[in-house]
Structures are given as structure tokens and as C-alpha cells.
């Protein structure tokens, strides 16, 4: 029986690191996950949570320090939930993420294959092209920032080091406007108040900026004052949008957008392809590493110009359009109608003719294409964090492609899905992690899977 109690302190050797970047050790044989500790350290831990098979705690004192421990660059690092690895050197982060992918593949999928060292960034700061800031209030002062780790407590952040400087500027202007006009902010417990979030999107290649004000209503007071302040202080401002979200939900954006200044999209490039980005568009948040990620995906696809490719979860068509350059024909399948419409526009803007985007459930559309005589040699999948639905994987296996390229943002669901593919007669040739999210525990990977 677990005799450890909340509030007790223990000396613990940290032998590994967990899924969210926490240190992992043992107390009387029970695993303890320690916030703020690193592999190789000996620390004093105070227990915060006691569960049947594991414990959670935080670092009170470091007795023996890791060679990879550094002082955080960010002043909010110990409170903000955005970055969990500010205290780990960048080399240490890349080693952790490489090992994380390897461990997940072996532990969950029983897959033993070549996992390459994670590809990192030369400058792992200011890399995000999208910032989503929550709005709150301390006393009478309106604040903007991020939630604390696993909490709905808002940490006020004036300058986020992983955001593009123009995103920080947008939020600074909006916060000033909120206070000057004394506009109500949303209270998630009561479901009342007007301003919920500020979302800033920045196109790295073109410098265009979109400011999105998420509101619990249909309009805002002092609208002209906001527009004028943003125009004056934000270089490259092309769009100011009200996003209507009146539901009591954790979702940041609602489905309705009202343009109050400029246009409804901004434009950016990935390599030489141009993309229109709308308020609801999914676009990889790290444009520098996205080029590396997509280059690796296309390399793994092994295209010679003769192949038919099916791109599953194709979004706004980014990977499909890159594949179309080297393939005979590409079919992109996506369940979100607006994303398909954006993808079609992007194909048109870039003059890409050998691609077709299909709106529908992937498992159904894959089977339909097969019945119509489409023989795909290569399938590319880029699913959300939950991984591929079982029906989708069955449908992919059912059309018997020679190669599958799996782009993953979650090593655990990647491991699960690769196990299914291996049981169905495929083998995982190699996996390349790419660090899309420096200073966080997230890691993207590309896996090459071939028919045996």
C-alpha cells in the first residue's frame, strides 16, 4: 500500500524524463514525476499528488545538478504553462526529444528501428507564427498571457520569447486598448464578459499580420480606436478580425468571423509555394522547421514523377502541393470543408494542376478512389494528436500502397499506429524527429514505412 503523503519531502535520484518534460525517479519503488527536475539530478521533492501507482511532486532543492541545466531565458518560465523545458539546454532538449520518440516506439509499439537525432534550430527563439493569448483581469487591470501549467490561472506575459515580435506587439496594443476603454473580459466560470482571447498570425516571408479578437458577443465598443492603434503600432498589419465564440467551451475560436479592417486572409510562403491563411486555417506554427519537415516527408515518399499519391488529413493542401511537384497525381482527403476550399484556392494560386482535393471521411474516400481504379503507390498521413482512426489505417492497408509516410505530432499515437501497420505486413524503415516546438516537450516526427 502507498504510504507516501501529500506535503512530505523526499530525496530522489532522477533516472529519466517523462512525457511532459518532468523528471522521473522512484520512492519506495513507486514512480514519481517531478516538475523542474532533469535526468541525472538528485533533488529534494515535495509531494503534490498521490495516486495508486504513481506520485507527482515538484523540485524544492537541487542536490546534484545536471550538466544540461541552464538558467531560463524567460522570466515567466517557472509559472507559465507554455514552455516546460526552459531550464534544459537546447542540446539537452534535442537529446530528450530523440529519446522520447525512441522510447515511445519501443515501449508502446514494440518497434525497434533507426531513430535519427532530432533536427533542431539554429536560433530556437521567436519561431512561432501564431500566438494565442488568453485575456483576464487582476483587480481592475486587464491582462493578457497564458495559463499556468495544468491550470486556468492566467500568468500575465508581456513578451513571449518563442512568439514572433509582431505577435507580442499586437497583444500589447490590444491590452492597452482594453484598459483605456475599460472593456469587460470573459470569465470562464460565469460565462460572462466580452473579450476572450487575442490571436495574432504573422507571415514570416511576407511580413503580413492578422489580429483576431475573440469575443463572447457580436461586436466591440471603441472599435475605431483599436483599429487605429493597431494600424499605427503594428508594421505589416493587413487584417483585423472579430471571431465570435459565445459557447461555453475550451475551444479558442468560434466559427463566425467578421472583418473590421483589411482583408480576410494573409499570405505566406513555404519555400516557393504561396498559401492564403484565414483565421481558422491550420498552418504549421514554425515555418522555418516546416520546410525541413516537408522536405523529409517528400524525400521519404521517394517520388520519381510516375507515382499516384494519396495525402490523408491534407488540411489546406501544404504537403499535397509539395508532393504534386514530384508525383504524377495527388489526391488530398480532408474532413473539414473550409480547409478543402482553402486547399483548392492554394492549388489555383500556385498553378498546380495535378492535384484534387476531396471533402469527406478518409476511410470512405480512400475506398471510393480504389473502387474507381486509383492505384496509389504512396500514402502520406499527417493526423492530429490523436493519430489515425483505426478505420483510416484499415482503409490504407486495404489499398496496399508500396510506401506510407507518416507525419506525427505525438510519439505515442505514432507508435500505436506503426504497430498496426507492422502487424498488417509493413515495416518501419526509419524515423526522423524534427524539433518544431523548442522549449516545449512536443516533438514532430516523420516515419518511412514500406510494404514487406
UniProtKB/Swiss-Prot annotation:
<dbReference type="InterPro" id="IPR012340">
    <property type="entry name" value="NA-bd_OB-fold"/>
</dbReference>
<feature type="domain" description="TRAM">
    <location>
        <begin position="3"/>
        <end position="61"/>
    </location>
</feature>
<feature type="binding site">
    <location>
        <position position="80"/>
    </location>
    <ligand>
        <name>[4Fe-4S] cluster</name>
    </ligand>
</feature>
<dbReference type="GO" id="GO:0070041">
    <property type="term" value="F:rRNA (uridine-C5-)-methyltransferase activity"/>
</dbReference>
<comment type="similarity">
    <text>Belongs to the class I-like SAM-binding methyltransferase superfamily. RNA M5U methyltransferase family.</text>
</comment>
<dbReference type="InterPro" id="IPR010280">
    <property type="entry name" value="U5_MeTrfase_fam"/>
</dbReference>
<dbReference type="InterPro" id="IPR030391">
    <property type="entry name" value="MeTrfase_TrmA_CS"/>
</dbReference>
<protein>
    <recommendedName>
        <fullName>Uncharacterized RNA methyltransferase TTE1812</fullName>
        <ecNumber>2.1.1.-</ecNumber>
    </recommendedName>
</protein>
<keyword id="KW-0408">Iron</keyword>
<feature type="binding site">
    <location>
        <position position="313"/>
    </location>
    <ligand>
        <name>S-adenosyl-L-methionine</name>
    </ligand>
</feature>
<dbReference type="Pfam" id="PF05958">
    <property type="entry name" value="tRNA_U5-meth_tr"/>
</dbReference>
<keyword id="KW-0808">Transferase</keyword>
<feature type="binding site">
    <location>
        <position position="160"/>
    </location>
    <ligand>
        <name>[4Fe-4S] cluster</name>
    </ligand>
</feature>
<dbReference type="GO" id="GO:0051539">
    <property type="term" value="F:4 iron, 4 sulfur cluster binding"/>
</dbReference>
<keyword id="KW-0489">Methyltransferase</keyword>
<feature type="binding site">
    <location>
        <position position="284"/>
    </location>
    <ligand>
        <name>S-adenosyl-L-methionine</name>
    </ligand>
</feature>
<dbReference type="InterPro" id="IPR029063">
    <property type="entry name" value="SAM-dependent_MTases_sf"/>
</dbReference>
<feature type="binding site">
    <location>
        <position position="83"/>
    </location>
    <ligand>
        <name>[4Fe-4S] cluster</name>
    </ligand>
</feature>
<feature type="active site" description="Nucleophile">
    <location>
        <position position="409"/>
    </location>
</feature>
<dbReference type="InterPro" id="IPR002792">
    <property type="entry name" value="TRAM_dom"/>
</dbReference>
<keyword id="KW-0004">4Fe-4S</keyword>
<feature type="binding site">
    <location>
        <position position="334"/>
    </location>
    <ligand>
        <name>S-adenosyl-L-methionine</name>
    </ligand>
</feature>
<dbReference type="InterPro" id="IPR030390">
    <property type="entry name" value="MeTrfase_TrmA_AS"/>
</dbReference>
<keyword id="KW-0411">Iron-sulfur</keyword>
<feature type="binding site">
    <location>
        <position position="382"/>
    </location>
    <ligand>
        <name>S-adenosyl-L-methionine</name>
    </ligand>
</feature>
<dbReference type="GO" id="GO:0046872">
    <property type="term" value="F:metal ion binding"/>
</dbReference>
<dbReference type="Pfam" id="PF01938">
    <property type="entry name" value="TRAM"/>
</dbReference>
<keyword id="KW-0949">S-adenosyl-L-methionine</keyword>
<feature type="binding site">
    <location>
        <position position="74"/>
    </location>
    <ligand>
        <name>[4Fe-4S] cluster</name>
    </ligand>
</feature>
<dbReference type="GO" id="GO:0070475">
    <property type="term" value="P:rRNA base methylation"/>
</dbReference>
<keyword id="KW-0479">Metal-binding</keyword>
